[in-house]
């Protein structure tokens, strides 16, 4: 997982991944230096967008008004690069990590970075991990589908095969870069598992293009620069809520990507981190997950009809099954093959 990264790239990532919450702005270097000495603080690194993480943090702060929350959001690849830079400096700043690149969590577990913690109410949760041991817990069952611009695509695609063959999608279907986006990486791994690498090649041959990130590819579809894309549920839902001419279509082979949350073993604010993970699994927080447009991990959540999301049990049952340990072993190869194909 943690590859050797050029110093310049690490510095860039450190600058890019900035504070988005807590005090409402970037944190100074002095504040960062005091991180370990501040008992009433919590630092979260996440790939979740503000439309999802923002409401959850506000709910947590309402129940824990004495805790200052500094949440920092970026793509999974940038987060892992930042963590590697911090490891090289001798101190991880984050208490919690919450992304969708499942293999990273297996690698961090293998390297002894994660604290085992089973959140309160675990028996009420849907667990997608057969080898669960408390090192990380799914906080949502993210789904991806074919997002179409309804002004460009007159009829819904009937299958994954449609976007690899239909001229309507030629040179106008976008995929986020799996080197940057955890959900994109997992989606490519799932599609390869279900249909073989030949399917990815045929997507390329029909003119599919690589975009920078999971948000950008949905933006480009909403703006009409693309006719369609491989899109994340809640990012698409947020655009639809703002009036974008988009629709999410789910083929029967469902792309379900769990989003694990974990505590770092050397976290400076471990008690606060446990409180946050406990809150994240509550009915209140999981209802916020659903209202943001993605699939919660609790069965007792009322799903918003406007997003056409699968029920949590259905997402777990119908998602393409994959061995995450095997995906970890093949991660570099998958990213390299994709990058060589989609230059």
Task: Please report, for each region that a protein language model flagged, where it lies by residue.
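C-terminal motif of bacterial Sec signal peptides marking the signal peptidase cleavage site
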Residues: 16-19
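Periplasmic-binding protein-like
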Residues: 128, 142, 201-203, 210-211, ...
């Amino acid at each position: 997982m943690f590859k050797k990264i050029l110093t310049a790239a690490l510095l860039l990532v450190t600058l890019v991944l900035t504070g988005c919450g807590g005090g409402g702005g970037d944190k100074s270097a002095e504040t960062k230096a005091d991180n370990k000495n501040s008992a009433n603080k919590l630092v979260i690194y996440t790939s979740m967008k503000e439309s999802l993480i923002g409401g959850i943090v506000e709910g947590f702060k309402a129940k824990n008004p004495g805790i200052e929350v500094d949440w920092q959001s970026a793509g999974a690849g940038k987060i892992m690069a930042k963590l590697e830079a911090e490891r090289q400096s001798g101190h991880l700043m984050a208490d919690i990590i919450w992304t969708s690149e499942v293999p990273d969590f297996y690698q961090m577990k293998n390297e002894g970075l994660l604290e085992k913690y089973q959140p309160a109410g675990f028996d009420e949760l849907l667990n997608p991990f057969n080898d669960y041991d408390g090192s990380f817990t799914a906080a949502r069952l993210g789904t991806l589908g074919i997002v179409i611009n309804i002004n460009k695509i007159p009829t819904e695609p009937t299958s994954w095969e449609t976007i690899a063959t239909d001229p309507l999608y030629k040179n106008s279907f976008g995929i986020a870069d799996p080197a940057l986006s955890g959900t994109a990486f997992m989606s490519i791994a799932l599609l390869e598992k279900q249909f073989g690498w030949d399917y990815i090649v045929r997507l390329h041959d029909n003119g599919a293009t690589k975009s920078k990130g999971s948000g950008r590819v949905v933006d480009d579809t909403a703006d009409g620069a693309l006719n369609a894309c491989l899109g994340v549920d809640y990012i698409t839902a947020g655009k639809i809520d703002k009036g974008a001419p988009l629709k999410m279509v789910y083929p029967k082979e469902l792309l379900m990507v769990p989003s694990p949350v974990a505590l770092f073993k050397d976290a400076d604010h471990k008690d606060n981190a446990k409180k946050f993970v406990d809150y994240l699994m509550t009915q209140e927080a999981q209802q916020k997950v659903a209202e943001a447009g993605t699939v919660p991990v609790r069965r007792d959540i009322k799903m918003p009809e406007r997003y056409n999301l699968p029920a949590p049990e259905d997402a777990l049952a119908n998602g393409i099954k994959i061995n995450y340990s095997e995906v970890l072993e093949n991660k570099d190869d998958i990213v390299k093959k994709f990058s060589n194909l989609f230059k």
